[in-house]
Amino acid sequence: MSQNQVPKWIQLNNEIMIQKDGKFQFDKDKEAVHSYFVDYINQNTVFFHNLKEKLDYLVENQYYEEEFLSLYSFEDIKEVFKTAYAKKFRFPSFMSAFKFYNDYALKTNDKKKILERYEDRISIVALFFANGDTEKAKEYVNLMINQEYQPSTPTFLNAGRKRRGELVSCFLLEVNDSLNDISRAIDISMQLSKLGGGVSLNLSKLRAKGEAIKDVENATKGVVGVMKLLDNAFRYADQMGQRQGSGAAYLNIFHRDINDFLDTKKISADEDVRVKTLSIGVVIPDKFVELAREDKAAYVFYPHTIYKEYGQHMDEMDMNEMYDKFVDNPRVKKEKINPRKLLEKLAMLRSESGYPYIMFQDNVNKVHANNHISKVKFSNLCSEVLQASQVSSYTDYDEEDEIGLDISCNLGSLNILNVMEHKSIEKTVKLATDSLTHVSETTDIRNAPAVRRANKAMKSIGLGAMNLHGYLAQNGIAYESPEARDFANTFFMMVNFYSIQRSAEIAKEKGETFDQYEGSTYATGEYFDKYVSTDFSPKYEKIANLFEGMHIPTTEDWKKLKAFVAEHGMYHSYRLCIAPTGSISYVQSSTASVMPIMERIEERTYGNSKTYYPMPGLASNNWFFYKEAYDMDMFKVVDMIATIQQHIDQGISFTLFLKDTMTTRDLNRIDLYAHHRGIKTIYYARTKDTGQDSCLSCVV
């Protein structure tokens, strides 16, 4: 492509990298945004004389749903839009504007013209959340236009649209051990995938390869055959060609098929075995870590023989208690393995392909508030959703199915930097909780019965956070420092406090709690023990100054909250989890999730041109605080995630960043340290090719 064919905004964006006086020209990105609007967005946005004409057109032509708009008078709707436009919001970087208009803004059916600006999308989402309450809609507008809170991609993309996918993006399905159950799980996975959801499945109950069916030995194909079916199903069923279907399979490490399961992700694997798009995760109980640490032989088990012997599925049982009994029981079929060799294989595979994800099962369940419903047995596609589940049993045509509890989770994220600048933790957490609750209550997924049942019974939501590294760097705090952990400790304690408080307030307002609340550690009061006995306020003066003007809940406040919950209960069974925040963090001009950045200046290729995205807030005076994840001490990153994790009732999508010079032994050491520090899950392991490094720090 010749220079004059490259759009002006791309040329300006590229000029960031042309040094002037030995420094990058970060201001060129603002010029690129200006050009993008003047030369492209404004030229390609459909013109309407006024808001009335615009809304009438969008409703009549089936772009917007009429139902939620009809809850308001036109004057009220106008007020909400006025609130959004009064902010005079400007995208600070080309990438943030490009991501919004490319991925989220409503366009004409032929995709050629733009029908929504950022303010329009926010107003529509706010009107949808507020359900007829104009004042609340304005509060939501302010929350989103100030970029204090960001709904997840499916919610932000779909809310208010007539032709849309679901507002919930994340589903977890239990799979029972019969052909009826397996085929029903594949069917439900395809239905959810069609709605744009990512689906993860627990395969730990399935018979291992070579187990008996109706006492006929060597009859079963094992979990890999089911994985192949799922792999094809997700590739077939996507959201009308817009979002690709995506799925994950989890397996307990004590399942006999664990080696075959891992081999599906080997780069050299045979086509008959390899799964191309299905992600995989391994569930590791403490017992396995103990056997590896002591360098003892371990056994993996044929799960159906356990079910026949004990009447319970292996993944529902406590391995610390049952492992030796399984080993000693001659009726439980088993195979001997070397646990260290298996951990080495896990490390090798992760440095090769990034998979599998890892869930340390006992770290999850030691602090799980709802073990009375079920322990947590698997996670989701991004390894941050951790909830109780109960397997369904699908019978033949004229018999009644037993519907269990599957999992759905609707997500959203606080933008730490803006919440801290506006000193609005309490307000933001409570409004965000309300918006997520509305999404949960309006979601009704009819073709996934156990998801539908659980959504009504469990009322789970997942509030997360983004821009941790950006906030720390712009305040001159190194991500790996004790001060950074001190900030995170206080901030996430406060998020937890206000999230519990709002959940209890909603329970009081509605006179309703989540199903089986009575057996939870919220009801017994045990959940609050550490908070009424430990002060989580900042230890460093610099960090205390950041919270100036905000009330930090004290142990006394926690005692009062404990009493309030004892009186009114909790509306949500699960409240907090930290998702990876991919494209949505670009729109927010935010560093992703609570992870360190991967690059100070990202290079992206779109079509025939390159674009550059300097990390939000990056400047020559804070360059070294934007340290790249691959240059960090991963043990310190583990410490940061462990600090945050103690305040998050579910999980954190935690990526490991590895250099290609690391050995499998190095990775095993990080894993074992993560396990020791109480980390619940590890998402991808990303490996960087260090042979291509070039130093940019001299040109700031």
Swiss-Prot record:
The active site is at N380, C382, E384. Transmembrane segments: none annotated. The record marks D177, R207 as: Allosteric effector binding. Disulfide bonds join C170-C409. Provides the precursors necessary for DNA synthesis. Catalyzes the biosynthesis of deoxyribonucleotides from the corresponding ribonucleotides. NCBIfam families: NrdE_NrdA, RNR_1b_NrdE. This is Ribonucleoside-diphosphate reductase subunit alpha. The lineage of its organism: Bacteria, Bacillati, Bacillota, Bacilli, Bacillales. The gene is nrdE.
